[in-house]
Amino acid sequence: MRAVHLLALGAGLAAASPALANESVLKGVANPAEQVLQTVDYANTRYSKLDQINASNVKNLQVAWTFSTGVLRGHEGSPLVVGNIMYVHTPFPNIVYALDLDQGAKIVWKYEPKQDPSVIPVMCCDTVNRGLAYADGAILLHQADTTLVSLDAKSGKVNWSVKNGDPSKGETNTATVLPVKDKVIVGISGGEFGVQCHVTAYDLKSGKKVWRGYSIGPDDQLIVDPEKTTSLGKPIGKDSSLKTWEGDQWKTGGGCTWGWFSYDPKLDLMYYGSGNPSTWNPKQRPGDNKWSMTIWARNPDTGMAKWVYQMTPHDEWDFDGINEMILTDQKFDGKDRPLLTHFDRNGFGYTLDRATGEVLVAEKFDPVVNWATKVDLDKGSKTYGRPLVVSKYSTEQNGEDVNSKGICPAALGTKDQQPAAFSPKTGLFYVPTNHVCMDYEPFRVTYTPGQPYVGATLSMYPAPGSHGGMGNFIAWDNLQGKIKWSNPEQFSAWGGALATAGDVVFYGTLEGFLKAVDSKTGKELYKFKTPSGIIGNVMTYEHKGKQHVAVLSGVGGWAGIGLAAGLTDPNAGLGAVGGYAALSSYTNLGGQLTVFSLPNN
């Protein structure tokens, strides 16, 4: 069996590295009865050591209790559990509930921010929020209007709040946050509004801004060292971003940071991805558009970037690079390596050395991916590290006002933000995917602050010549770059996965099923239809010696935007309304937490 180790899961790491991470987070991460981060641990593995529910008995799961959030539209993320309190969040208006598990989920406190509803039409792809984080006795929430709030975990009282962006300029938030040491790290949304996007660190106790690093712009705004920050093993050089944009286009260049963050306490580096360049019309922005579509490794104290890797230079398809970075220590080619595995929207599964940024593996995790033949990993090649684009599917080469047809994947990617999971018992990654292709027609657009800056019309449909569905749930070998097994889904698998020590992997489906599969074989062991489509992430916790599994249901997100927002034009929702029109025959709006456990006997 391959030697595989997890980061930030055990108490031993906390003891070994007391100065390199937040002690309260490490304590919570080391206790599988709780969940203090949306990602389960700093390494983003979404793996639980709980094994009371296992492959033999998961078929006996029953609904233990439910809770209505009182809010409709897309429910992403998951609850947190700290001690006997469960913390539940909602999409806009981002209500937070504290539920006492010792008292039948009694509401202990409720926080309901007063946000201007004008932020709703500025949010891309539904009014979702990917959840809370816990650190140092505080619940951290990044609201839709970009207000970052620290709440007292016991009372719900506001400790402090700070505004991270300006919705009138198109800046909003849908993401969770990452507490690291004495800081909290947050991103920003707005790539469809021409926002120059960034990552920001705030002081955990006061909310004071410590540093801000942009994805695009001059070196001082990027927080890079032209001689020490590297890409593919070489210094990036002076003005590495500016040289790849025409004139001042970088000022409206996007590269937003609305995905997930991970952190390696040993290397003292945080990892995340930057999103698409603005506009979606590639003809309007010549050049590689650095550093959009990029994996970043930064020091959390200073923001200084150690290395960057751009996955999709001069993006022509909206293949946002924001998906999670999963950190593992594994043997690669016989040597122990600190690895980073990333399943990108562009359809390639990447394995990198997270210390150096070296790309070790880049393979398609859906065989229908056709926009590029491969990623060139020949270090002697002029195109080293770049995808080799197929001309037929190049919206740049085909030109403005030309409909490029049959591009796979669609803009929402082979996987969007819905997070994968990793099991150290199998050494496999469990990935909820989209099996969707598109037609893409770019057109010229003018930038106006606070107005959509998209410049493309899309239509989406199931991948042709396949099983007819729009998704798969797969197991992936990140060392070989191969699919080990694949389960077809009727719609995109839009719920985040959870792997457990009980040899069970959980995930949710757009039509509302919670599913449990065998981690080794993929065999379906259990499913239950919840009241609405699942785009949330499955979580597990232990209360009074009993393991529970919980998931939020509430259809929405990009794939479910037609239902969530009541849209009927097939081209609306950037093409998703037509692509997922059949979803309305299987589910409807909702907002519910469903909690499962085994029978008492």
From Swiss-Prot:
Q: Does the keyword Protein biosynthesis apply?
A: no
Q: Which branch of life, at top level?
A: Bacteria
Q: Which SUPFAM superfamilies match?
A: Quinoprotein alcohol dehydrogenase-like
Binding locations of pyrroloquinoline quinone: 130, 174, 189-191, 258, 345, 494, 558
Supply the induction statement: Highly up-regulated in the presence of La(3+).
Name the keywords, alphabetized: Disulfide bond, Metal-binding, Methanol utilization, Oxidoreductase, Periplasm, PQQ, Signal
- The residues that the entry says bind La(3+) are 192, 276, 318, 320
**Identification of the protein by name:** Lanthanide-dependent methanol dehydrogenase
Q: What does this protein do?
A: Catalyzes the oxidation of methanol to formaldehyde, but only in the presence of lanthanides (Ln). Contributes to methanol metabolism when La(3+) is present in the natural environment of the bacterium, allowing bacterial growth with methanol as carbon and energy source. Thereby is an essential enzyme for Ln-dependent methylotrophy. Uses a specific cytochrome cL (XoxG), encoded by the adjacent gene in the locus, as electron acceptor. Also plays a role in the transcriptional regulation of the mxa and xox1 operons, most likely acting as a lanthanide sensory module.
GO BP terms in the entry = methanol metabolic process
Coiled-coil segments on the chain, per record:
none
Cysteine pairs forming cystine bridges in this chain are: 124-125, 197-256, 408-437
Q: Subunit structure, briefly?
A: Homodimer.
State the Gene Ontology terms under molecular function: calcium ion binding; oxidoreductase activity, acting on CH-OH group of donors
Where are the active-site residues found? 318
The family database entries (SMART domains) matched by this protein are listed as: PQQ
What family does the Swiss-Prot or TrEMBL record give for this protein? Belongs to the bacterial PQQ dehydrogenase family.
Cross-referenced Pfam families, in alphabetical order?
PQQ
Its EC number is 1.1.2.10
Q: Give the record's cofactor note, including how many are bound.
A: Exhibits enzymatic activity only in the presence of lanthanide ions. Is inactive when binding Ca(2+) ions in the absence of La(3+). Binds one lanthanide ion per subunit. Binds 1 PQQ group per subunit.
**GO cellular component terms listed in the entry, alphabetical order:** membrane; outer membrane-bounded periplasmic space
The residues the entry assigns to the signal sequence are 1-21
Entry's localization field: Periplasm
Record-linked InterPro entries: PQQ_b-propeller_rpt, PQQ_MeOH/EtOH_DH, PQQ_rpt_dom, Quinoprotein_ADH-like_sf, Quinoprotein_DH_CS
